Amino acid sequence: MISRDFKISNKLGLHARPSAQITQVASRYFAEVWISKSERRVNAKSIMGVMMLAAGQGSVLTVEADGPDEAQAVDAIGELIASGFGELD
């Protein structure tokens, strides 16, 4: 299992479009992928779960993965979060 923390930098946080982007990326991998904020942990392949995190700008998310391509899954989601989901000014 691999785990890394990422900070949400876009102004609107995890609204519908970024949540959909995360689930699309997570679904490309065989690994089980979870995202946590505080005490809430959700399946990263579930758009409803990701949206329920209600992660605003400045929130820190922990991305965890377990499986044959776990490192690639965490890296890909981390790159997406770092890019601000294409919403950075």
Model-predicted segments: where are they?
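Intrinsic-disorder/low-complexity, polar/charged segments enriched in Ser/Thr/Lys/Arg/Asp/Glu/Gln
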Residues: 1-5, 60-62
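Compact, glycine-rich, soluble single-domain proteins
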Residues: 7-57
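C-terminal structural segments of small proteins and small subunits
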Residues: 56-89
